[in-house]
């Protein structure tokens, strides 16, 4: 199994980067795993048209990196909510398609609709707001938890 995490921008907070490293190490027990940073568009003003342009550009960059046969999971505020066991079952089912999973997070402005159309799975972490870097950390933790659940290992500690 291959698992890739894609995120626009590069995290500067050491404590979060340390968390990424820890979960990449833990996940390497179960799969070949990687974290890839994508270009993040800088917006000079928060106008709707500027944000839309930036999201389209970020989406184009992301879609170039995702192969047609990869299963794309997106973290999206509009996505479906799952508990940990449901999410583990979903990952297990999707990984049986070809074993190549990609988890994509949007920038702080979200995701373009072209990404939503390409996604195989759209899920929400919570109704709470997180930075996209923290959302990636939480996603990695949940993927790790899912792997443990799917193998019948203790997962709640």
Predicted region positions:
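Structured adenosyl-cofactor binding patch, chiefly the S-adenosyl-L-methionine
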Residues: 113-157
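N-terminal beta1-alpha1 ligand-phosphate binding loop
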Residues: 1-27
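Short glycine-rich anion-binding loops that position phosphate/pyrophosphate groups of nucleotides
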Residues: 11, 77-80, 107-110
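Short, well-ordered alpha-helix to beta-strand connector turns
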Residues: 31, 69-70, 119
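S-adenosyl-L-methionine/SAH cofactor-binding core of RNA-modifying enzymes
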Residues: 37-99
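General small-molecule cofactor/ligand-binding pocket signal
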Residues: 6, 34-36
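Loop/turn-to-beta-strand initiation segments
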Residues: 2, 99-104
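Short glycine-/acidic-enriched loop or helix-start segments at secondary-structure transitions
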Residues: 15-17, 83-85, 112-115, 134
């Amino acid at each position: 199994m291959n698992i890739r995490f894609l995120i626009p921008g590069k995290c500067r907070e050491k404590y979060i980067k340390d968390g990424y490293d820890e979960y990449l190490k833990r996940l390497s027990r179960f799969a070949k795993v990687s974290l890839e940073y994508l270009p993040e568009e800088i917006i000079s003003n928060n106008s709707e048209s500027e944000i839309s342009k930036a999201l389209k550009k970020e989406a184009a960059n992301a879609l170039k990196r995702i192969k047609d046969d990869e299963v794309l999971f997106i973290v999206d505020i509009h996505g479906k909510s799952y508990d940990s066991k449901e999410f583990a079952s979903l990952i297990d089912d999707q990984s049986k398609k070809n074993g190549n999973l990609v988890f994509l997070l949007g920038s702080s402005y979200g995701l373009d609709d072209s990404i939503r159309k390409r996604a195989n799975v759209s899920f929400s972490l919570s109704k709470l707001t997180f930075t996209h870097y923290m959302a990636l950390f939480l996603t990695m933790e949940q993927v790790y938890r899912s792997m443990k659940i799917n193998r019948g290992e203790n997962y709640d500690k």
